[in-house]
Amino acid sequence: MTEFLKLKKSNCKNCYKCIRNCPVKSIRFSAGQANIVGDECIICGQCFVVCPQNAKEIVSGVETVRVLLSGDAPVYASVAPSFIANYNGAGIESLQTALQALGFAGAEETAIGATHVKTEYERLLAEEGRDILISSCCYSINLLIQKYYPDLLPCLADVVSPMQAHCLDLKRRHPGAKTVFIGPCVAKKDEADHYQGIVDAVLTFEELSGWLTEAGIAIAPGPHAESDESRARLFPTTGGILKTMACAQPGYTYLALDGVESCKAALEDIRNGNLHRCFIEMSACIGSCVGGPVM
């Protein structure tokens, strides 16, 4: 996989905080430096959050997006609904105006894709014989299961993430367009890279804020318009997926878990046969996406 989290060796002061806080112990200390083991990393960004020396660096997508904007194809932004927590007082219309000033053709909330995803979850739960179903929205959780619980992959919903669902929808409605996801998550960069042709680039809120500041563009406060996808705006909060779903399957339990340790505990319970007939919403970040590493 492409490395989207890198170490600035000159900044590392050997404090071991990243090693102690990595939930899957994918950081090794060698030759006087902490090193991320890519094949074991789930890209949760916790090492980036806890590093006091700014020795962890997220690879920026700004130049990639600049290249897209310089081309002939229109570029549309899919904006994670957690932007409300990052850009206080701004609605999607205000954010779209700022993005259009950068050269984007338009911007929409990823909640449009989330609506499609929750419908697919409801359909899967209605299938006869369904036992455990785990949400597939959080790419770090998907990687956790793929790398550390591969025997539980049949439990992971075979449904694209809201990011992919929305960008596929944008490309269907705007043939030939390019798509850029903007959100609080570094793992989405790897997801976009892994599933080529759906999401053409990913920016974090931090990258977008820096770019707007550099360009002298301010996001004006504005109302948050109601839409058919308003309930799907709950997706980035803990339990948000469940709040959008019709949780009515008889005999089913619906759980919402956030934080890698809580999710690992549940996965161990599933592996040991202690959980049955459950839909489990899992998020790697405590607080779900609104607690993302790059808010």
Question: Language-model features: where?
Answer:
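Short charge-dense sequence patches
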Residues: 1, 14-20, 40-54, 93, ...
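Generic signal for short, ordered secondary-structure residues
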Residues: 1, 20, 30, 44, ...
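Short, intrinsically disordered, charge-biased short linear motifs at domain edges
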Residues: 1-2, 8-9, 27, 37-38, ...
